[in-house]
From Swiss-Prot:
The gene is Suclg1. Succinyl-CoA synthetase functions in the citric acid cycle (TCA), coupling the hydrolysis of succinyl-CoA to the synthesis of either ATP or GTP and thus represents the only step of substrate-level phosphorylation in the TCA. The alpha subunit of the enzyme binds the substrates coenzyme A and phosphate, while succinate binding and specificity for either ATP or GTP is provided by different beta subunits. GO terms for biological process: succinate metabolic process; succinyl-CoA metabolic process; tricarboxylic acid cycle. Pathway: Carbohydrate metabolism; tricarboxylic acid cycle; succinate from succinyl-CoA (ligase route): step 1/1. It is found in: Mitochondrion. Residues 1-34 form a transit peptide. This is Succinate--CoA ligase [ADP/GDP-forming] subunit alpha, mitochondrial. GO terms for molecular function: GDP binding; protein-containing complex binding; succinate-CoA ligase (ADP-forming) activity; succinate-CoA ligase (GDP-forming) activity.
Amino acid sequence: MTAAVVAAAATATMVSGSSGLAAARLLSRTFLLQQNGIRHGSYTASRKNIYIDKNTKVICQGFTGKQGTFHSQQALEYGTKLVGGTTPGKGGKKHLGLPVFNTVKEAKEKTGATASVIYVPPPFAAAAINEAIDAEIPLVVCITEGIPQQDMVRVKHKLTRQGKTRLIGPNCPGIINPGECKIGIMPGHIHKKGRIGIVSRSGTLTYEAVHQTTQVGLGQSLCIGIGGDPFNGTNFIDCLDVFLKDPATEGIVLIGEIGGHAEENAAEFLKEHNSGPKAKPVVSFIAGITAPPGRRMGHAGAIIAGGKGGAKEKISALQSAGVIVSMSPAQLGTCMYKEFEKRKML
């Protein structure tokens, strides 16, 4: 068993308690399947579903609830092509002028939905994700925070054994293509169509990076909040692969935080795939430099355990991959602008 598998199993046990051992073993088997190339390739192929635009048809799970109603209204006002939603037992009714369905499968069949956003309470969110996977919705964005980690281990096991559905989240702000499609809770007005791809584990720091890249005139091509939980559906590498292949994305902002190995893995990916004269500039900020070991800092995944997952190690790994690491989130925009200026990209 590799160090990554051991670390993931330890995290599952730590987060879920001793009863998490079974879930940890399940996750370990999932990682081993990925490493052996079994089915992992099919889920990787779903990265293409991360691209959203003005033609993306979105449904909302938890449509008639308080959060679903508020954020669906915001999405409609932004111009997102929201085509309906689901609330079990309320099928056949109208909400916000759109049809309500009992199941995701029915919603997809009737509307042609290509994406779903989930605003379902934590105890039921994993079941909502699984329902979307079973309905083969291409992109599922789960906003819900506080989903039991054992539930997400099982969801991840299911995800990595198929290739039709891509999950972003949970515990994330969502994804936005400025001016075209907003799926999530981010404030639309701070975004501006532009040249920078942003990926982040932190929601509020995503907004900070967005505001700054807007202020310096660079704007954003696509912004993805991958969430702060240990077991999510999309990681840094998935998003970096999308950004590196996207001609509209000329620079990348990566915002990480303490806990796990996602940033170190991203650094290795960038070393291999973003080097040479045509490499895209990457600017990063890692939150939690002063965080004490063993204490969870906000997100379930933001914890330094067993001497691993510290900010200094992540910063060192990213710098070795040619990433410009800002020591302050307030400098992300200016760091990227200076790099564009240096490369004569303005």
